[in-house]
């Protein structure tokens, strides 16, 4: 505990928080161009082929972003919108591609959580 005299001499320094998504540069989303679309395998207890894309952003960064949902239409040179949010079992993947915007199609035949996957309302 500092004394009052020590606090008068030098005031308390506020701790600076480190951002978890630096490539977004304090923006909610960023546009980018896919440079490579591929699959990656997750960390130890899990087993799958997760769909990911390497994206060059308008902020100048090149990041790895996860493609959520079943099936996608992305390929090299596709223009995508990314948001923050990591994938726990894929090391180095700290961003998600937003489905249903720009060149990314929404998930087909999706009935639940549609807004998260850019799916239109089903025809009754």
UniProtKB/Swiss-Prot annotation:
Keyword Ribosomal protein among UniProt keywords: yes
Gene3D superfamilies: Nucleic acid-binding proteins (2.40.50.140)
Signal peptide: none
Protein name: Small ribosomal subunit protein uS12
Gene Ontology CC: one annotated term: small ribosomal subunit
Molecular function per GO: rRNA binding; structural constituent of ribosome; tRNA binding
Similarity comment text for this entry: Belongs to the universal ribosomal protein uS12 family.
Disulfide-bonded cysteines: none
GO terms (BP aspect): translation
Keywords: Methylation, Ribonucleoprotein, Ribosomal protein, RNA-binding, rRNA-binding, tRNA-binding
Ranges where the record places region Disordered: 9-28, 104-124
Gene: rpsL
Subunit structure: Part of the 30S ribosomal subunit. Contacts proteins S8 and S17. May interact with IF1 in the 30S initiation complex.
Pfam families (alphabetical): Ribosom_S12_S23
Matching NCBIfam families: rpsL_bact
Domain of life of the organism encoding this protein: Bacteria
Positions of post-translational 3-methylthioaspartic acid modification: 89
Organism: Synechococcus sp. (strain RCC307)
Protein task: With S4 and S5 plays an important role in translational accuracy.
């Amino acid at each position: 505990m500092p004394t009052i005299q020590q606090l008068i001499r030098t005031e308390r320094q506020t701790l600076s928080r480190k951002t978890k998504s630096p490539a977004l540069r304090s923006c909610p989303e960023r546009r980018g161009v896919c440079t490579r679309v591929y699959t990656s395998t997750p960390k130890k207890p899990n087993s799958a082929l997760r769909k990911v894309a390497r994206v060059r952003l308008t902020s100048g960064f090149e990041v790895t972003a996860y493609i959520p949902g079943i099936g996608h239409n992305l390929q090299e040179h596709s223009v995508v919108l990314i948001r923050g949010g990591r994938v726990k079992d894929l090391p180095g993947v700290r961003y998600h591609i937003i489905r249903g915007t720009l060149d990314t199609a929404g998930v087909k035949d999706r009935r639940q959580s549609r807004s998260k996957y850019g799916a239109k309302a089903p025809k009754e």
